[in-house]
């Protein structure tokens, strides 16, 4: 803020609404009437769109309204008056629905007044925040039992009054009584809540959700009535054409007759301009005449209304009457007068004025100021703005209507036929002009709504909607983020010599980036020198800012002039008195010098894509003369995910003291040592430094005094780092035969010089990455041991100073703070660089070679593995390896035809070959290498974690192994070969992509080709997943950005809704809690930690007794007492810790595994020892210090922590769940399914069921067979059809098809599928024939269709998919009534091809799969609306379980019916199903065949009966559990997993309960979260979300802290449903701006404007839109300074 001109006001909230005619006229300075923009001299015309009253037209012109030039004129609105009202295209659907719900006779809603009143009461209560009362008001009618008929039974609101015993008057009287009682209830509820101070005007997610539900129900209720409940009239239906025309469809004959009998007549709303309606509404009576031109005066029905009929050539208007917009408006005006009470609750209205129907129509169109439609000038030519084209068209259409209306009102002699025709033609042209005007208005607001937008050739000018929406729209491109000044961008290059928290700035940036520093006595000399140096010499300055804000540029000044100005920096401005500003205010402000960036300034560095918090950090500037690139330390590479192969980075220079201090103390690099995703370290040394760390700390490295001191000096830089040239050294470890220091002593010396002088040294025990066995069989160099800051044992490698948890640097960070840890990294980096220069490091070919023995091992193993391919193939098809090749090929042929079986073969083959690969690698590396570690530098790199892994070594030295594509082996071509050089269907491993060669000695051409295939797949995956994960992260971000920790430890959304009572359920910060359970570390460093936490000052401020004593009770009796966190806030009560942590501390103190805690006896003797009570107090204190800070944006952190790792995941990863199983969706597709679509129908639903103890394998197998879906085709061996023509003479002839199904033998199908012969018999004679009948009918119908040549939309051509109806208009419509709720807004779905071609790298919109899911959600099957029982009951329709069915069948078998009777009975059943069934038979003895004969007329089209029967067989189900297709036993996850489990494909939880004898009911699990929600409730679903998301990441070994997952799961379920992170989910956000900045801007804008929503700017997005600081982090509180009266000077 400029203190010279402070701004004392800010935007508090934003209210949305709609400008009416008067508002537009008030803000307008001129009516625009001239469609011509410029005259012949290129000057703006009067009354044109560039009229100077609207603002300056070019740079040199002056505004005619405020007389300012183009820099200062704010711009002024104009307006265009339309000759007739036009429909507002964004509100058209809403308006159309209201029209359809209106009775055109009484102009009330067709719904009864009582029901409308109920909705009014509910909405009113919800507006006051009374959710429960809103539910209760529905029951008022039942409890009071007001309306009774003559029998004394309650009368349903909607029941027909004429049928009941009551007369109209009685019902009306009772309805009035009921309404009065409801009103009293509402008034009492509001009064009570006011009294109890419960009223909360704040709109919450829950209230909004409920309100939308009520509104949706209201629209559904009013639009579902055919006859008016109030006056019993039948109103005509309507039909709309596009967004421009509405037609009235005449009443049916029956309804017309009814209306004539009742004598009801519609008033003519066109003829009647009825002043009283307008006065009722609070309008001036003459408002019409002033706003609408003489067109309104035309009586469109005066003589011959026929010209208005059938004007449309479209078939939709056949027999229908075209309605003018005036007529529609007049109907709705009357509705709004009659139903004003409820409509004012639904729609926005001004204070003191009721809601008006005029909001749906445009009479005056506001014209934006010229500065928002600037003309572009090229030389002498002026090009108009593309927006003007739309406005000009409206002007031209308006003028055309005015001239046509004159022609049509000319007096005509009724006898003149020609005159009448002319007038009729004029009418027709007038109507067409009305429609054209409507199209032009539509184009202005939404260019997609205009049908004649000019085809493919020309680009359509964007409408207002297009300007606002999508990534290039106003919201996302110009409000949510902007381009900034004081930024620089360049290539980055590495520099190991600067500090890790510094950034090297090239001089070219240093002289351009400036900071406005106020001049004071303290910095006068510095600022003076800067001004004298000027803009080109560093450190100089570019401008001086005077007290009144004027700037003086130093660019054109000479050194003498600059010196003169520099000397006056403390002199007050001379012309202040005459300036318009107050002298007293400005006298206290300083001059400012825009000085160059200098060493130590904070710069914010950022590398895109900015996926998580550490992608943007603050570094200290260090100007490096002679450089041209940004120089950065290696330790930051991980944070930015940067490398130096040409990456560019952005640099920003904060311009205010607040921003600088936040950068210096919060965003600084040292404070970002731990990543919020998992709490692990992110910064560490890499590559050469790691190798040098290993060499430096080897047991056999010794240094002379010179080397020791030289290394220490180079590392510590005592001259620069504020150590005043002093270095503390250690005595040499070796005195004889010479004086030598060890490498370990150098590390100890570094720590000694870095640690704070008043603190004890570091005590640490950790593991090295290099195992001890690599040095010698019994070496202990694998464990690192520090005692009081001295390195006693162990090698320092990646696990000590790389980005690894619990290593040296991480422990220093925990003990001494981030600054010391940052300095340690810098010092180690310089130390290892210096050592590398002393020692050198290289890698040679000999490091890659195997010795003779190693080569022999490799050769022998490969020789033994040659037959593995044949063995695996033979085993898979159940043959021995010496079986004839022909037999093997015959069996394999079947496998290759079935993709699932082929997948099984691939898995078997891969398993066998991967075993070979592993055995070769294990044998040859490291034992078979020519040079052994540590002298093998390749091994040094891989073993220490510096670069590469064992995979790289093995591919170079051993073999490449099996190549995989999408988890499968290399696929075969049609010829049966994988490449032309192989034999068809070859079983060798090589032909399936196994590469036995190595890079060292070269690979064969075929192997090279396979390797390239696998590489290409990886590249494609990388390219595709960037956009997928980018959009996923954006969806998470927009929903969660408002979630923030409050001062009461709760996590709340920006509307105040509580999402969690404790963040992550224990209130701990992810990064602070990492060391919390490292009890050994805490005990060893007890003294240092006590000093760090300043125990005495903390204990004086908190209660240390209450919570601790309560926690002991609560832990002993958890069912009696609530958890301590629930009762005592952890920030004020020491000992208020989570139960899990308390148990862990207790367990450690009791077991005392490290013998660090003294017993009571020992601590009595020596008071300084660490005893149990001291240790517990320390741990409680550490817990309190690890609490999450209030104001922390945990929602943003959670979304980044899910989004960032998802970019590391492969896109389409499939996990093979065992033979016969479908793949399980994993990776990004699964994440999108859980999080973005919250899908109720997931791609691969499965259940995991644990078998009860004692269930035998045989019973388990039988259970799987019972649950499996069995279709008839699985028991049919072959189908035979005989066709013959029978009968004499052409009239009597017929075609007979004899169908015979040959089944497998009864023993085979009973063993394999556990199915009885009777089941097959019954299925064949019943279900099979029904399905066959349907298939034959469908086939004949299609062939008839083909013959007739007629094309029907519903029957696609061959090879074309039938287009789902929903695709035609992907509007968010729920049922027909939902049209009223939502505008058909398809922001993210339109122009799909355009977005695909652009492939916006990181934030693409929803893809096809998302749209399908969105459509599913839009239907009525929203999870929260699902009737809990209905859906699952339907899932298990058969009233008996499968086992009951079998028992019943067996009983039937015992009551044997004779075979002949069975045959007769089944033939009778068959004839009922198929009238043309002539004969039916079944093998009742052996159950091995079934026959049926079907007769057709001779002229029936030829039927390909075999394929039809095969199709019928595959569709005929013998037995199934609905929803479940397969069941199979689950292979154990590990050797420890001994519990037998089965997996089902498909989910039906209720049906599985039937099998309680086999299945453990407490161990059922499914990956279908929506099913869990329906059956087990919301808490179970919430836990399932956490489990599912974490298992998706678990597959890739990515650690995401459970606190983030629990927050996401809580957010998705805290409303009681399963909310998706998409635009359906954000619908219930209370901030309109937040919704608009996400997707479908105009849909949410329309909604907000119609409802009159208020955005209170509590959401981060909405604050950003209006330019206010966010209310989170440092913005979540204000700082007040105490005002102290200073004594008079």
Curated annotation (Swiss-Prot):
Reactions performed catalytically: RNA(n) + a ribonucleoside 5'-triphosphate = RNA(n+1) + diphosphate
Name any GO cellular component annotation: mitochondrion
Pfam families, A to Z: RNA_pol_Rpb1_1, RNA_pol_Rpb1_2, RNA_pol_Rpb1_3, RNA_pol_Rpb1_4, RNA_pol_Rpb1_5
Question: Which positions carry Phosphoserine?
Answer: 159, 161, 1438, 1441
**What protein name does the entry list?**
DNA-directed RNA polymerase I subunit rpa1
Where can this protein be found? Answer: Nucleus, Nucleolus
Domain of life per record: Eukaryota
Instruction: Tell me which SUPFAM superfamilies the record gives.
Output: beta and beta-prime subunits of DNA dependent RNA-polymerase (SSF64484)
Q: Where is the composition biased (Basic and acidic residues)?
A: 269-280
Q: Name the species this protein comes from.
A: Schizosaccharomyces pombe (strain 972 / ATCC 24843)
Q: Where does Mg(2+) bind?
A: 643, 645, 647
Family label: Belongs to the RNA polymerase beta' chain family.
Q: Which CDD domains match?
A: RNAP_I_Rpa1_C, RNAP_I_RPA1_N
The entry lists its GO molecular-function terms as: DNA binding; DNA-directed RNA polymerase activity; metal ion binding
Span list, region Bridging helix: 1005-1017
Q: Which gene encodes it?
A: rpa1
Its biological purpose:
DNA-dependent RNA polymerase catalyzes the transcription of DNA into RNA using the four ribonucleoside triphosphates as substrates. Largest and catalytic core component of RNA polymerase I which synthesizes ribosomal RNA precursors. Forms the polymerase active center together with the second largest subunit. A single stranded DNA template strand of the promoter is positioned within the central active site cleft of Pol I.
